[in-house]
Each structure stands twice: as structure tokens, then as C-alpha cells.
């Protein structure tokens, strides 16, 4: 059985203020894959991730999540399909691992962001799946 493609890019170029910093990025992620993005400080790792997460506008090309172009996907729908936790935004001494995992449920909560028992069960299930 062919694995479902979750995310791919097509001719993606990223940068700031219309200036291309990294060109023709090719990414293809399938269900169940674990991928790392490795490089020295300033190489553009965060710029690539922020562009994929729709926090930065792509300079050229497209990003697709489940074969839907991100430019056509509302932010709330994207948040249900993808989350990225940047380490500089976390204050780990004030958060448990469960707190960080629970951040992925917030797009499914109401305006107050309060987790329901169902949300808490999903968090527990996710933690069990990755054995933490």
C-alpha cells in the first residue's frame, strides 16, 4: 500500500522582503516519517519551517498539506493539520510535556482554549503512541 503524502513543496523559495535566501526547496513527507532539518545557525532552517507553517510568505513556489495548497487553506484549518513548536517560545520550567502536547489541541477548542475531557484523552493517547 502506498503511503499517503502529508506535505510537499513545489519549487519553494524562501526569504525575507522579497529577497530569496534559499531556492528550489524540495520536501516530501509521508505518513509515519520522522524528518530532521539540520544546519548551522543562520542557514535558514527556521525560515523554511516558518514558511511551511504559513508564518512567512513564500517568495516563490508552493507548499501543500494533504495535496491542498496552503494559500487556499484558512489558518484555523491549517492549525488542525499542523503545528510547530519553536524552542525559543517555550519556557520549559513552567510547562510539563503534557502541556506542550496539549498545545496541538487548541485549534479544536472554543474561543477560551479550554480543553475538554475528550481533548485530554487525545493528548494522553498521543503521548502513549510515542511512549512518553
Locations of regions flagged by a protein language model:
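Helix-to-loop junction immediately C-terminal to a conserved catalytic motif
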Residues: 53
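Conserved ABC ATPase "signature" region
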Residues: 117-132
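Conserved ABC transporter NBD signature motif
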Residues: 61-69, 78
Amino acid at each position: 500500500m502506498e503511503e499517503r503524502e502529508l506535505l510537499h513543496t513545489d519549487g519553494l523559495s524562501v526569504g525575507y522582503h522579497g529577497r530569496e535566501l534559499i531556492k528550489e526547496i524540495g520536501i516530501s513527507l509521508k505518513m509515519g516519517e520522522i524528518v530532521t532539518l539540520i544546519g548551522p545557525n543562520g542557514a535558514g532552517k527556521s525560515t523554511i519551517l516558518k514558511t511551511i507553517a504559513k508564518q512567512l510568505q513564500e517568495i516563490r513556489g508552493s507548499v501543500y498539506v494533504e495535496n491542498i495548497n496552503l494559500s487556499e487553506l484558512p489558518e484555523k484549518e491549517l492549525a488542525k493539520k499542523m503545528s510547530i513548536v519553536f524552542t525559543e517560545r517555550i519556557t520549559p520550567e513552567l510547562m510539563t510535556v503534557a502541556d506542550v502536547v496539549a498545545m496541538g489541541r487548541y485549534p479544536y477548542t472554543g474561543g477560551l482554549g479550554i480543553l475538554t475531557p475528550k481533548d485530554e484523552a487525545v493528548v494522553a493517547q498521543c503521548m502513549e503512541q510515542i511512549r512518553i
